[in-house]
Amino acid sequence: DDAVANGVHAISGVVDS
């Protein structure tokens, strides 16, 4: 999954806290 600056994975859509 590509983690974006906002912490959201663009592919899986999982949010990184």
From Swiss-Prot:
Known function: May act as an antimicrobial peptide.
Protein name in UniProt: Septenin 1g
Chief site of localization: secreted
Tissue: Expressed in skin glands.
Keywords: Secreted
One Gene Ontology CC term in the entry: extracellular region
Similarity remark: Belongs to the Frog skin active peptide (FSAP) family. Septenin subfamily.
Compartment(s): Secreted
The organism's place on the tree of life at top rank: Eukaryota
Organism: Osteopilus septentrionalis
